[in-house]
Amino acid sequence: MTIIRKKHPLIKIINHSFIDLPAPSNISSWWNFGSLLGLCLAIQILTGLFLAMHYTSDTATAFSSVAHICRDVNYGWLIRYMHANGASMFFICLFLHVGRGIYYGSYNMIETWNMGIILLFAVMATAFMGYVLPWGQMSFWGATVITNLLSAIPYIGTTLVEWIWGGFSVDKATLTRFFAFHFILPFIITALVLVHLLFLHETGSNNPTGLNSDADKIPFHPYYTIKDLLGVLILLMAFMILTLFFPDILGDPDNYTPANPLNTPPHIKPEWYFLFAYAILRSIPNKLGGVLALILSILILALMPLLHTSKQRALTFRPITQTMYWILVADLLILTWIGGQPVEYPFIIIGQTASIAYFTIIMILMPIAGMIENNILDLD
């Protein structure tokens, strides 16, 4: 078996990636989320494939085809709710994975980090298009509002929006192309994940101390395969509790009403995992400014290696920046809450304050805190 594992051209690649891979001996459970994201992607592709067998991407039948899946297809209700809540679990793992990367300074592995940002954009695009497919009220109006943002682009905006719509409004052509993109993107994401891993294995994993761990490595299997398995069991347990006991808790009741272009829902809002970005978008009174802030809210992650001023990599031994980090986490939770609230006092001013705080903490306060810590520890 050892001979095949180390000599066979295909199995050799798997061996070097998941079995004999040298891994730091001290990585914590925060390093489990990579494998959990792989599991989430596999669940989404499998459940999505079975849903696509019964779904029809036509405005007249899309809503009823989803109802048909839930009522008439064997375990269709389970597949549908696994897919819908699987997206939420995917984003929970994504946010924790990115948060870990920021906390422990993993953004200093620039190629891996940038590939991760591209992956984040791809997953967000996929999730947005997936939300449109059931063709409920929030699907239709969410698609209308978000695609309409592109009209803020000077000169080509209106033409671009009509080109994406395939007409003068969100309609049959839009739904068909969104289904096509929603189907193909997860496979593109899978390819990007392999590139993400390729870049990661060039440098090796980071660890909680932020120090070089070349002198103290252990094989990935069996140590981290067992450790990842525990994470998998916990995730699956949480996932099945969510899916089987509270399947609609993260959804919007408006999406159980078929799409009606003549009736606007009182509060148009995206799924919970986009609310922080939606709050930042809404907090700027100018349309183009809002769109730029929306994109920058994610793209700012690409600036993190440039904004790193500390002589230490991780926040493990940096109490001032740690405080800034946890304020940032709290700020993101506030933005998520505000994104789901109506546009009225006091939510407008809270959203604007939280949006300013978000960019200020990342671009100004954390770099300054890093420099202060250098001086305190005399690391200049």
Swiss-Prot record:
State the annotated membrane topology for this chain. Answer: Multi-pass membrane protein
State the free-text cofactor note: Binds 2 heme b groups non-covalently.
Instruction: Return one GO MF term.
Output: metal ion binding
Residue positions annotated to bind a ubiquinone are 201
* Biological role: Component of the ubiquinol-cytochrome c reductase complex (complex III or cytochrome b-c1 complex) that is part of the mitochondrial respiratory chain. The b-c1 complex mediates electron transfer from ubiquinol to cytochrome c. Contributes to the generation of a proton gradient across the mitochondrial membrane that is then used for ATP synthesis.
This protein's GO cellular component annotations are: mitochondrial inner membrane; respiratory chain complex III
Protein name, entry field: Cytochrome b
| Family note | Belongs to the cytochrome b family.
Q: From the record, give the transmembrane residue ranges.
A: 33-53, 77-98, 113-133, 178-198, 226-246, 288-308, 320-340, 347-367
